[in-house]
């Protein structure tokens, strides 16, 4: 039909030449090709990739730019928003598609470039930038490489697993060894749980022009080191991400990355480790995590449900509060398309810390009638208790639990009216001390080094408290331990320096 509409003899194999300055071609292109496929097969999203040619009848006009423009308009007619996925078409093309970094080769060197490429895409307006998680083509099979790439992808604007057509190049988690499969599964579920946080940040990007991912120098323009840390970036308002882009050490079984921590206190969201900022520090992580640090006072909202693909507004929220400072966060949720509902979380730090949850007072269709909360105070010492302030001014004790490995206290708020303002007071609230000796033991227990060296390092670590860190580090240096073993122990000893 399209060929006949354009006056092309299809039986002779004549092509329809793409030129989007031709209005007749433009109209037929959508009417006879795209709209028919959409109606027949239920397609509602298009990836536009390599079909537009390089020239138009108007000198200097990039046909890809025109293609992206009209495809976005076509998408907007269906749902009022418009979303397409396409190639980069030069400066200014960010206004249309989700972009991507091209056909990446599957190597560690290629992975190491992706965080920098993704973060700096924000400099040209491409806040919605993506990469082929795990790499696209050529290269080699490496389970650890695939996992580290996926971990980066979870903390990217768009999470998208993709590869070239190769029967050996699958990205499904079950195509990797069991240890890696389980970690991939955990991270993929985490990405889905982050929808409340991501949707809030994407609204901020749409209305205020602030991208989800920002190079470190956006918030630290006066620090020259911020310009040198190419792979470190902000993920939303108060989270720092440092992807690991090199293989693990055979000695520590951990990967490492050099990070710059801005001023203040920072807490790792996976381990609960507390760090003092305003310095550079090497961070070491096993396969099951990467450094994701929240600034003290940061509040991160997650969907507390752990299974399924639901995208409705959850009846139970997991709210992570980074201990150590005051903070606030406004959660924005869409009740229905373009009808927003906001909830403000305010945290006052202290021995008796106070978290206040203030939802909008107008119930809206699409929001749950009731909501429960799982409050996770990360970076806290053991011994916290919690109470909720009741309407009559009295307090009721809440269920709490402590995870020593992750240094976090969890407080459970049962179901209550979605419009209820909630005040939670925690008592004996203090920052964790990082359980340094215990963590060094765990590190050494995992390390693949001589047993005698493990014993010597651990003996020095047990002097923590009676000797200062400088003395302990001097003693460790004399042992001539492998560089990564020394570095990992040093991170634990000096995190709070």
Q: PLM ranges: what are they?
A:
Residues 76, 120, 208-210, 233, ...:
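A generic structural signal for short, solvent-exposed coil/turn residues
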Residues 230-231, 257, 343-345, 398:
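Residue-level detector of beta-strand structural context in well-folded domains
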Residues 292-394, 405-497:
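Accessory, solvent-exposed terminal regions and/or long lumenal/extracellular loops of proteins
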Residues 1-289, 481, 488-497:
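Catalytic-domain carbohydrate-binding cleft regions of carbohydrate-active enzymes
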Residues 267-287, 385-413:
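Solvent-exposed beta-strand/loop surfaces of large extracellular or lumenal domains
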Residues 234-235, 261, 349-350, 402-404:
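Generic beta-strand structural signal
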């Amino acid at each position: 039909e399209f060929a006949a509409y354009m006056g092309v003899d299809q039986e002779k194999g004549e092509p329809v030449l793409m030129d989007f300055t031709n209005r007749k071609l433009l109209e037929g292109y959508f009417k006879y090709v795209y709209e028919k496929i959409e109606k027949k097969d239920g397609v509602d999203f298009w990836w536009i990739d390599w079909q537009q040619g390089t020239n138009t009848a108007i000198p200097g006009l990039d046909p890809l730019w025109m293609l992206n423009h009209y495809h976005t308009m076509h998408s907007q007619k269906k749902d009022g928003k418009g979303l397409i996925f396409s190639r980069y078409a030069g400066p200014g093309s960010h206004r249309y598609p989700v972009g991507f970094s091209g056909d990446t080769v599957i190597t560690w060197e290629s992975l190491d470039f992706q965080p920098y490429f993704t973060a700096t895409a924000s400099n040209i307006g491409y806040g919605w930038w993506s990469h082929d998680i795990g790499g696209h083509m050529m290269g080699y099979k490496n389970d650890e490489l695939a996992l580290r790439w996926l971990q980066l992808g979870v903390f990217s604007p768009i999470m998208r697993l993709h590869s070239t057509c190769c029967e050996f190049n699958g990205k499904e988690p079950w195509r990797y060894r069991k240890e890696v499969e389980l970690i991939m599964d955990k991270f993929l579920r985490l990405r889905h749980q982050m929808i409340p946080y991501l949707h809030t940040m994407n609204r901020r990007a749409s209305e205020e022009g602030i991208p989800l991912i920002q190079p470190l120098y956006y918030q630290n323009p006066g620090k020259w080191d911020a310009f040198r840390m190419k792979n470190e970036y902000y993920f939303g308002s108060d989270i720092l991400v440092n992807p690991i882009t090199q293989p693990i050490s055979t000695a520590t079984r951990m990967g490492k990355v050099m990070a710059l921590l801005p001023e203040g206190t920072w807490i790792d969201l996976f381990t609960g480790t507390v760090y003092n900022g305003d310095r550079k520090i090497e961070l070491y992580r096993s396969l099951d995590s990467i450094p994701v640090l929240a600034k003290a006072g940061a509040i991160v909202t997650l969907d507390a449900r752990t299974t399924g693909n639901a995208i409705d507004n959850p009846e139970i929220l997991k709210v992570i509060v980074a201990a150590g400072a005051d903070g606030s966060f406004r959660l924005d949720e869409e009740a229905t398309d373009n009808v927003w509902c906001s909830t403000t979380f305010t945290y006052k730090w202290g021995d008796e810390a106070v978290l206040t949850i203030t939802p909008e007072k107008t119930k809206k269709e699409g929001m749950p009638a009731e909501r429960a909360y799982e409050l996770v105070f990360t970076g806290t010492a053991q011994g916290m208790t919690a109470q909720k302030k009741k309407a009559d001014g009295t307090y009721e004790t809440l269920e709490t639990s402590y995870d020593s490995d992750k240094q976090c206290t969890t407080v459970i708020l049962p179901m209550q009216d979605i419009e209820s303002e909630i005040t939670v007071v925690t008592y004996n609230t203090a920052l964790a001390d990082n359980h340094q000796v215990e963590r060094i033991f765990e590190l050494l227990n995992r390390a693949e080094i001589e047993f005698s060296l493990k014993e010597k390092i651990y003996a020095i670590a047990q002097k923590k408290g009676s000797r200062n860190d400088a003395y302990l580090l001097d003693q460790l240096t004399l042992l001539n331990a492998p560089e990564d073993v020394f570095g990992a122990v040093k991170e634990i000893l000096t995190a709070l320096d």
